[in-house]
């Protein structure tokens, strides 16, 4: 057999070989570092035997997929340690994730002392160095095995698998888990790890299920890499919008209001209004027409669109179909409403494209276990829009939507922080979608070609499309590495028929338009969270809730400070005066901690000369300036939405 390696070189063998044997044949160093193999694109155990021609990549912890295998094994060591120390704990699931791993247990919550004890037990298990072995059982035997061990969550997972399935297990010493793998050869491969936290999580993410206790951890190939990661985690905690956004009085949450329903505080409202005005102005420049549509509709509307069949579980339904004459639902999106704006009058081919935009409030019934700060909420605001176009206009208009999204990202200073994804349908799960394979394949091909023509790197994600069409998702990671979708642009060749939308062509015949579903900037709440974490609260001046703080050096200069404040406000600058009887150093520090970009210090000399002493987060002490000079510069900075570089590091503390 011939094994083709990642670098294109080939190895020829007369008999079957395991992945680890081939790794040793390449180099002993590679074999010692190996975590798994990738055979024809599938990640497998190192013990997997290869008996035919294939492509092989030996994965180490330097590879994302190899590191995931190491972390998956670490999660099994964690579960073994927990059940050693807490024998009554029931195990649920324990996958690797982007930043490490977790394992869910049915048991009381863990304290930090508990986590420290579990870490010690994990080190004992690793020191013993048990080999990891894979074996299989029939579905019936697997169920019986876990029933005997009183592990109900494992039983439920197996019962969800088809009858006749072969069920794989992994054992390390005297501890065994249900698992598809792959795993390391031995627990000794888990050399550097840390348990980070414990929290609650619903079984399978649904609040209808049992509340479990989750332990998060991370693992790396070396202690140096682990140390670097833990330092990054400390910085992430400092930037976490869920903490910083509350400290900056941008938003808060209240138990009696409910999860996923944040209160946007005055500072947050200022920022959202700035973003909204800017987005609406940019859309107006590009020919968008504003609409304002209802927050809810009868179920009839969603039955026409297909949302009732494909998305009902994600909607807030008001009423009972069996007992009520009319059932309503809060809208999860704006599209079917804007279709009726279009249908309210007849349109010629000359009228198209029509670009409808709306700053919409939407509602989605997310599981409470998914709620997090401003990134995952049940009510949110979005810059939504729908373009009704002729088929021959589709490519240009779609590219223009991408260009608008890229412009918005560039202005916000986050264009380098995103990834692009072509979200496709899953042809093996056709019941999730409307339309036939030909339409789906054609539209996906169009989007693929556009992204290539625009030189945009992208990945293709099967099964991530909306039920009515493929889309471009522009994603970003939060400070903890979790990826969220920020902006979506969708190609829809199907819903116009569902709603009997048409235009009159040059021959007087009715024709179906195409539809582009898009956002310019996406969800405002999620964007706020993104910006808080990106800038650690030190936003570009145009977005700052407070742009200038006037600080008189003593009470006798309060009147002059008030005059300066009045002039600033007349020029549209958001400002305040600190009239407290505190030391100047304290006032300056307080303004800095409040992340105010500019402080204007006023005293005898400033009042006498009609000037202000400028202190900025960017350059520190900028000296004394005429107020008009300062006004000109800050107004220009705000108008241009300039992102100034912070030159003085102590101002950033």
Language-model region placement:
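NTP/phosphate- and nucleic-acid-binding module
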Residues: 1-90, 97-653
């Amino acid at each position: 057999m011939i094994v083709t390696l990642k670098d294109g070189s080939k190895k020829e063998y007369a008999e079957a070989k395991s992945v680890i044997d081939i790794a040793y044949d390449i180099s002993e160093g590679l074999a010692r570092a190996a975590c798994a193999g990738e055979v024809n694109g599938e990640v497998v155990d190192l013990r997997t035997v290869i008996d035919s021609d294939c492509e092989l990549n030996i994965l180490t912890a330097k590879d994302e997929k190899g590191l995931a295998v190491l972390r998956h094994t670490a999660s099994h060591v964690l579960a073994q340690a927990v059940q050693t120390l807490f024998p009554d704990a029931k195990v649920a699931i324990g996958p690797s994730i982007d930043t490490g791993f977790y394992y869910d247990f049915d048991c009381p919550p863990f304290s930090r002392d508990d986590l420290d004890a579990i870490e010690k037990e994990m080190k004992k298990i690793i020191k013993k160095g048990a080999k990891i072995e894979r074996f299989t059982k029939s579905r019936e035997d697997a169920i019986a095995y876990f029933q005997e061990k009183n592990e109900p969550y494992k039983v439920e997972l197996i019962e969800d698998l088809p009858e006749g399935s072969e069920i794989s297990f992994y054992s390390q010493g005297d501890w065994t888990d249900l698992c598809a793998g792959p795993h390391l050869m031995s627990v000794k491969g888990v050399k550097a790890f840390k348990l980070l936290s414990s929290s609650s999580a619903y079984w399978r993410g649904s609040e209808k299920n049992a509340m479990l206790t989750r332990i998060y951890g991370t693992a790396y190939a070396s202690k140096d890499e682990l140390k670097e990661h833990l330092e990054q985690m400390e910085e992430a905690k400092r930037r976490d919008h869920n903490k910083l956004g509350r400290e900056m009085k941008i938003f808060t949450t209240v138990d009696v209001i409910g999860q996923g329903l944040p209160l946007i505080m005055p500072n947050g409202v200022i920022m959202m209004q700035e973003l909204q005005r800017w987005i609406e102005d940019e859309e107006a420049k590009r020919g968008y027409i504003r609409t304002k549509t209802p927050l809810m509709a009868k179920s009839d509307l969603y039955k026409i669109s297909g949302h009732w069949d494909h998305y009902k579980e994600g909607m807030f339904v008001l009423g009972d179909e069996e007992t009520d004459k009319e059932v309503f639902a809060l809208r999860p999106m704006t599209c079917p409403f804007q279709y009726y704006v279009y249908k309210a009058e007849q349109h010629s081919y000359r009228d198209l494209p029509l670009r409808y935009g709306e700053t919409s409030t939407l509602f989605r019934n997310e599981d409470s276990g998914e709620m997090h700060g401003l990134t995952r909420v049940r009510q949110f605001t979005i810059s939504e829009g729908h373009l009704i176009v002729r088929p021959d206009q589709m490519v240009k208009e779609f590219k223009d939507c991408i260009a608008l999204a890229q412009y918005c990202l560039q202005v916000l200073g986050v264009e380098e922080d995103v990834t692009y994804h072509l979200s496709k349908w899953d042809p093996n799960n056709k019941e999730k979608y409307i339309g036939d394979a030909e339409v789906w394949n054609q539209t996906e091909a169009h989007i693929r070609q556009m992204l290539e023509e625009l030189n945009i790197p992208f990945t293709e994600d099967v099964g991530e499309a909306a039920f009515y069409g493929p889309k471009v998702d522009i994603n970003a990671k939060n400070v903890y590495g979790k990826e969220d979708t920020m902006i979506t642009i969708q190609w829809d060749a199907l819903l116009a028929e569902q709603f009997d939308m048409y235009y009159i062509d040059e021959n007087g015949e009715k024709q179906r338009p195409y539809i582009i579903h898009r956002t310019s900037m996406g969800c405002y709440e999620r964007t706020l969270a993104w910006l808080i974490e990106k800038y650690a609260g030190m936003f570009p001046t145009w977005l700052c809730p407070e742009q200038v703080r006037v600080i008189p050096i003593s009470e006798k200069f309060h009147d002059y400070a008030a005059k300066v404040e009045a002039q600033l406000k007349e020029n549209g600058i958001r400002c305040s005066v600190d009239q407290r009887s505190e030391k100047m150093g304290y006032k300056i520090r307080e303004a800095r901690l409040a992340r105010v970009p500019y402080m204007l210090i006023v005293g005898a000399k400033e009042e006498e000369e009609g000037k202000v002493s400028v202190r900025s987060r960017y350059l520190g002490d900028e000296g004394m300036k005429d107020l008009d000079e300062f006004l000109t510069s800050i107004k220009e900075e705000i108008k241009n939405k300039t992102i100034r570089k912070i030159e003085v590091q102590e101002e950033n503390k």
